[in-house]
Amino acid sequence: MSNLYESIRKYKCGYIEEILNILDMFDPLLNKFQRNSCYEDMKSELSLFMFNLIDNFPLEKDCFKEDKFIINYIYKSLKNKFIQVNKLHQKVKSYETNIDIIWVNNCDYANLLSTVIFEDIIKDLTQNEKNILRKIYLHGLRESEISRELNISRQAVNKTHLRALEKLKKLIN
């Protein structure tokens, strides 16, 4: 096994084939992450990430003159990317499950897409604010109907509705 620092330096100087040697060095780690994931394209995702990682690698730092620091840096970066991709994949799977449930209920795709986007937008609000916004915008209920359903005043519903919209406005800006 050649010096990892030298391989990265050569790759950055234009020896493109060095990236294959670097990928071969980390192939067991990529395979491990692939086995530990439900996502079938995990190895490809991490390999592409490694290309970007090596391209932007900070070789000028003195601590990266030794292989042990480079290996640790790449390992931690790959692990963080693995976690990020897994979370994203689980979120997509969750949405797909919701899509299947909604399709069973004969919902159209445009409505489904807007519902998924709506849920993603309101994720940072309180449960009460989410509930009121869902009833107003997804179910088409008026504030007076919501107030009767929740046994609170119409003014309380209106105040919560406006507060939620203000929070969303701040989040967007």
From Swiss-Prot:
Matching InterPro entries: RNA_pol_sigma-70_dom, RNA_pol_sigma70_r4, RNA_pol_sigma_r3/r4-like
Keyword Electron transport: no
This protein's record includes keyword 4Fe-4S: no
Annotated stretches, region: Sigma-70 factor domain-4: 122-169
Membrane-spanning ranges: none
DNA-binding region (UniProt annotation): 143-162
A biological process term (GO) from this entry: DNA-templated transcription initiation
GO molecular function: DNA binding; sigma factor activity
Keywords, comma-separated and alphabetical: DNA-binding, Sigma factor, Transcription, Transcription regulation
Family the UniProt entry places it in: Belongs to the sigma-70 factor family.
Function of the molecule: Sigma factors are initiation factors that promote the attachment of RNA polymerase to specific initiation sites and are then released. Transcriptional regulator specifically required to activate expression of the toxin gene locus, composed of tcsL and tcdE/utxA.
NCBIfam families: sigma70-ECF (TIGR02937)
Protein name: RNA polymerase sigma factor TcsR
